[in-house]
Amino acid sequence: MKAGIHPDYRTVVFHDTSADVYYRTGSTIKTDRTIELEGTHYPYVIIEVSSASHPYYTGKQKEYSKEGSTARFHQRFGNFFK
């Protein structure tokens, strides 16, 4: 491997502020912030959405009735196709 061309890969803490969840994972992201977890200092990145807060993963997503919109379409434009 060539020296000096690869990004600095290190353990980083990502904080999902909407769910107040911390993720400790490897990353090459650059940040000036740090946080202390379990006696060790880590680079710290704030994120707004993660799997802990995204509606798709939490099951709090809205489901729209497809039958209602289809029926409404046929009610408005059904006569044009006959």
From Swiss-Prot:
Record has Ribonucleoprotein as a keyword: yes
One annotated GO molecular function: structural constituent of ribosome
One GO term of the biological process aspect: translation
Family annotation (InterPro entries): Ribosomal_bL28/bL31-like_sf (IPR034704), Ribosomal_bL31 (IPR002150), Ribosomal_bL31_B (IPR027493), Ribosomal_bL31_sf (IPR042105)
Keyword flag Transmembrane: no
Pfam family, one: Ribosomal_L31
Domain of life per record: Bacteria
Keywords: Ribonucleoprotein, Ribosomal protein
A GO CC term attached to the entry: ribonucleoprotein complex
Subunit structure: Part of the 50S ribosomal subunit.
Family: Belongs to the bacterial ribosomal protein bL31 family. Type B subfamily.
Protein name: Large ribosomal subunit protein bL31B
Name of the gene encoding the protein in the UniProt record: rpmE2
